[in-house]
Curated annotation (Swiss-Prot):
Keywords: 4Fe-4S, Cell inner membrane, Cell membrane, Electron transport, Iron, Iron-sulfur, Membrane, Metal-binding, Repeat, Translocase, Transport
Protein name: Ion-translocating oxidoreductase complex subunit B
Quaternary structure note: The complex is composed of six subunits: RnfA, RnfB, RnfC, RnfD, RnfE and RnfG.
Ranges in a coiled coil: none
Organism (species): Hahella chejuensis (strain KCTC 2396)
Organism superkingdom: Bacteria
GO molecular function: 4 iron, 4 sulfur cluster binding; electron transfer activity; metal ion binding
4Fe-4S domain mapped to chain residues: 32-90
Amino acid sequence: MSIVIIAVLALSALALTFGAVLGFASIKFKVEGNPIVDQIDGLLPQTQCGQCGYPGCRPYAEAIANGDAINKCPPGGEATITALADLLDVEAVPLDSEHGESKGKQVAYIREDECIGCTKCIQACPVDAILGAAKQMHTVIVSECTGCDLCVEPCPVDCIDMIPAPSGIRDWAWDMPKPPVSSGAIIATDQNNGMAA
């Protein structure tokens, strides 16, 4: 046999052996996640903003599962606190003012005529929602922006504002009809009953 064939067979045998060992190890030493952490993480807004004091939503979910307060997430607001309270069967408490205030869903807006193209906001964005290049105008992809507010601080010319997120069909806020405000309003059946008496 040729030396090349022997080398190929030897390497194939090694690859097969290492593959089997790695496959066995992945099954034997598999780490199961905590299902309550997954449920808590699913309720958090996934802005990865760090306003809660943790580097992202997953670490905060782990902290909540270990007994930390549920009211440290300003982007989630009261709705998230209520959902977490229902899940964990604890009392819903108001948002902790130390971590900010709930402002509803917001997105970053770059005043493009003032942008100097420094790329500091791009580097700060945890979800790559800002487009631009060095010495070029930057802009925000609204559908990707989580409203974490991390791009505002590093901007040297203060050309980034946080504005309310535009509403679409999925999150449209419809006004409920208001009842008529008249004292002593009578409906037709009441009026007819009163006449018959």
